[in-house]
């Protein structure tokens, strides 16, 4: 009965202060939905590399790079097999395959040692993990790839033809594992490489192209087993400093060179989002407190009457705490509806959706319950204490306006504004950095380039393909290369210059590459079709290489690159960002070749994109009918490097808007409370001739002062935080004064809008109403 009575009072007060109640509920709902989304995002990120059996015993062998020479995995398996297990991986991107004479393109394919399933103890749906990779030309498919390639038929024992030449037999089907830092959609036996490439390739001393994973024994201390592996490596005369990177640390570890096909998350972005979620929750709690106290003006008589009737302070506190719980539960329900409604938008903005199944687990339920309990205490105790402290005098509020309460409320709203202004500054700086990365001069023209994947079986047709393409007016230029901008650029190579070994990246290209890509030649000459016989002993080198190698008069300099062909530098190309602006410029050599080519780069007429694609497909189907026609646009491929930054940018924008909205509600609540307390004063001033704008100035100046105080605190905070954040980028924007000025203007506008409605209503109110009962 008591509980039912309290609920009736709660509903009555909700209707009585409808606007304030709705603002409280929807403010809480927005903040809770934001926190749930961030929570779901963090849970999703933390799924990576979990549920891998014995993962605490798995390490990746690293040096300065994330990949090893094939020889290392070979000697570990030969010398320590049965004690220490290891498996090498080698990735093939954009693999052209055929199934039942139908061409497909696999974005990623991994070759692995037969020990793969001993290190990674994944079960197979079909097939024997002990034998699935034991023989050359064996292949394992994920469920989704098996469905894509074979439909509902059983794929076990079926043939997949790679590059129209090599037949692989399907020996196993495994569950999709989207939450690994490397992809396992298609796993082929690494021993196949002995025939695909050349005999002995898996025992090569050089060629750092094989990420190597090691499982240490359970019954031997890890340090002893690690020393055993390192001692074995030292006997092989490798001079690099090797280390063991725990498997569970790889996803959140900083990216290192030659870390082929490894996906990384950002622990920094996670921490930022967690901090934002905490601040949003605090802002919502502060709002609720201030709006509840603002409503308390109209409830003083109710409290006084209850005290006259004998209600104890505990009874009153219980009533107000139950009201708080009602508001929070209502907000929680609305928050779930908000998330459900905006889930499709969330997927497009952040690349994820909130699934109830992902949130419901033992740990999450316990954490959520504790968080909810703390939130109820934060939002409920102070208003409950404040309301229950009213005296029995029913006509005047004695305790509500005490200076200590006013200082607390003002301090809370000041904190809200500091958070909001800081977020505005940080968001504007982040947007400026991301915009700088997207629009910076890359040193080449990434627009209007269509890329097609090719393989070794198509090399005899490349001249014909180019010749046919160039006959169409929609095609402006065609070139070939071994790599495309913005994709994985392989491992470091070493070039011998005057007896010194220097590192570089390389790209095999044809004679039309610079013109097609819009890369500028600084000095010397480019590759030319007129001297094709000499081109394989000539090289182009970038400006960074000249500086790092300290070359004087580099044109005509003789070098010995990693391809083993001594040649002459014939030209210096201006630096261009073949990788994103996250990376600093590195030495680069361009080699001319008519093999080792993997991509077609086609510059099209920007005004005729659809027609160009149609023409390209026509030629492709004529020249390369055995291979699937799949294309990509270079600008889109390049921008994929910034996928995590773009996702973070979107989330930061959304949560900043929510924080600003909540802070605005906080100002509205304090304005309502302050105006309500000064009703009599405003009435007297109006009777004495005060104009409306003077009343507005009187009521608003303290709030605007509060926003100015927030500027003073927020600006150095945001400057320091964003300077630290920008250090993560090799190329970064400047933090200009206009960002802080714009933040100040935005914050003032938001503050003015938040308080003006209440102030205007008070300023234009008939003074007779304010003084009626005085």
Regions found by a protein language model. Name each.
Residues 14-17, 24, 45, 61, ...:
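Generic structural signal for small/hydrophobic residues in well-ordered secondary structure
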Residues 113-125, 139-265, 464-640, 644:
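Mid-to-C-terminal secondary-structure elements
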Residues 38-96, 205-215, 226-228, 243-253, ...:
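Membrane-proximal extracellular/periplasmic loop immediately following the first transmembrane helix
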